[in-house]
Structure formats: structure tokens, C-alpha cells
Amino acid sequence: MNSVEELYLAGVHVAQYRDPAVWPDSYFKQALNRDINHIPSLIAMAKFEYGRYDFESAKEYAERGIKNVTIYNERVQSGEVYYVYAQILEALGEYKKAYDYYCKASWAADSVGKAMTRIALLDIRNKEYKAAIKHADTALDYGRKNPLAKTARVIAMKALGLDAAEIINEE
């Protein structure tokens, strides 16, 4: 393969089709050998290591991705790297920091729904039920069929003693 982008895309292909003979990380790592700052490969490796429950390694890749993607602008076009980093932090039990990074992820349109859903769940964890409802509603504004956001909303409403029947009966 001639370019970093080709290696990255080959890794994405292997990951999508779950080829049992090849792991996608070999492509992403080769891309990073050629360009240590290749942001898509850094994010892909963070996701790969997260999926293997190697959270420390995933965290390192995500931090490198954030460092490179935010060189010129903290408000990045895609919130994916912030979202992935927040997931890793949450898995490591760093809930406050995860919350902050989910908030950063929610600034990008591609990540609002999923980031607000995770924020609502962390609100519930912190017994901040009114905030959880607000954040779940925002997530639902970006995807009415989001089952996890609906569940978070119902849990928060029940915790406040509110009737959650209308959300349960929505299609």
C-alpha cells in the first residue's frame, strides 16, 4: 500500500467485515509508523484498544489524537475523538473528566445525541435527575428513537416521582 490513507482505509475495511484472519490494528499501526500524527489512525487505535479493554493504551492513542486534532481549534469538526476519549475515561472510573469530554464532544453535530445520552447517564449516577432529563431530551432531539436516552429519561423521571408513561408509550 502506497499511502497512510490506504493503510487506514484497509484497517477500516478489516474492522467492518471482521476478517478472522487479519486484525485491523496492524494496518493502523503501519499507518502510524509512516505518519505518527495521522489522526484517523490514532482514533481507530484508541477505539480498537478500548474494544480490547486495554484502556490505558486506548487513552494514550486518544490523547495523541486530541493533541493533533486541536492544534488549531478546540472546537473540532467531528466530536468523535472527544467522545472516544470520554468513553475511555468513564471505563477507567474518571467520571468527572469523562463528563467534561462528553460535553466537548457534544459541540460537534455528529456527536450530540450519543454524547448527551452518556451525560444523562452520568447525571443519573450523580443523582442529578433534572439535569439528566434535560440532557436526555437533547439527545432525543437528535434521534427520537434513541433507546438509551429514553431509558435515562424514564429513570430520572421515576427518581423525581414523575409519571414516565408518555415516554414509554412513544414510538
Predicted regions and their residues:
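Residue-level recognition of tetratricopeptide repeat
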Residues: 12-13, 47, 87, 121, ...
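Residue-level detector of the short coil/turn that links helix A to helix B
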Residues: 18-19, 53, 93, 127, ...
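Single-residue signature of alpha-solenoid repeat helices
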Residues: 24, 58, 98, 132, ...
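Structural marker of alpha-solenoid helical repeat scaffolds
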Residues: 34, 68-72, 108, 142
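TPR alpha-solenoid repeat register
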Residues: 41, 74-75, 81, 115, ...
